């Protein structure tokens, strides 16, 4: 496993710069551009002893982080033991079967597999940005989207366009190769489960549902 992991790390220096840009700069710009919500004025003042990261926020950050790491670790293990040229070959049984298989890989991770891994990683963060938008609002992530289309929506589009351009044209600079349109569609649809799970949880916690 260590040889496969080191191969990934050596290839991901410029990729991680892009990921940091997404998670820090772009995400901050997207969330800061959201229109003001009058409901904030109904909340009681926060105590001076309150932490910036509340317990619910910390629980969500830790929980999502653990799930992402667990899934991506399994994906890396799967790619290590399977020769994947398209996600249409993906097998749940193969994914689960290779999860704890620490034997030496039969082949090195291919540039295509590494490009798939990189894109899955980025789009998991992309969809989770929508969950961050709706955090503690008890509303859908799509609520008031029309009012934030020029800010949040524009940044979201910039992230998607940037990821496509990097993977398609980044070449040796980003250690990537172009993905097929089929794989782009599968990654977009598959990683979006992060958003839909968040929507389901928010629906269960909404005042209307509780009543």
How does the language model describe each region?
Residues 1-5, 9:
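Single conserved hydrophobic/aromatic residue that forms the stacking wall/gate
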Residues 3, 42-70, 105-121, 136-160:
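Soluble-to-membrane junctions at the N-terminal ends of transmembrane alpha-helices
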Residues 6-7, 77, 163-180:
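Transmembrane helix-loop junctions at the membrane interface of multipass transporters and ion channels
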Residues 10-26, 109-123:
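Alpha-helical transmembrane segments
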Residues 21-29, 33, 122-135, 160-164, ...:
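Transmembrane alpha-helical segments that form the membrane-embedded catalytic/substrate-channel core
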Residues 30-46, 132-139, 210:
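Juxtamembrane helix-loop transition segments at the membrane interface in multi-pass membrane proteins
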Residues 73-95, 168-171:
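Membrane-helix interface motif
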Residues 83-108, 178:
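Membrane-interfacial helical/loop segments at transmembrane boundaries in membrane proteins
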């Amino acid at each position: 496993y260590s040889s496969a992991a080191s191969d990934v790390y050596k290839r991901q220096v410029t990729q991680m710069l892009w990921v940091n840009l997404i998670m820090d700069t772009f995400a901050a710009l997207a969330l800061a551009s959201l229109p003001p919500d009058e409901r904030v004025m109904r909340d009681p003042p926060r105590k001076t002893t309150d932490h910036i990261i509340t317990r619910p926020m910390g629980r969500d950050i830790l929980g999502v982080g653990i799930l992402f790491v667990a899934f991506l670790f399994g994906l890396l293990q799967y790619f290590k033991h399977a020769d994947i040229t398209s996600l249409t070959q993906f097998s749940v049984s193969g994914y689960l079967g290779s999860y704890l298989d620490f034997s030496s890989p039969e082949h090195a991770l291919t540039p295509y597999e590494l490009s798939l891994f990189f894109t899955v990683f980025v789009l998991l963060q992309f969809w989770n940005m929508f969950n961050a938008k709706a955090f503690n609002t008890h509303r859908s992530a799509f609520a008031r989207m029309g009012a934030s289309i020029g800010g949040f929506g524009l940044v979201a589009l910039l992230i998607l366009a940037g990821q496509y351009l990097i993977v398609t044209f980044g070449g040796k600079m980003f250690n990537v190769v172009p993905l097929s349109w089929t794989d782009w569609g599968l990654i977009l649809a598959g990683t979006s489960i992060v958003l839909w799970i968040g929507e389901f949880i928010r629906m269960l916690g909404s005042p209307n549902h509780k009543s």
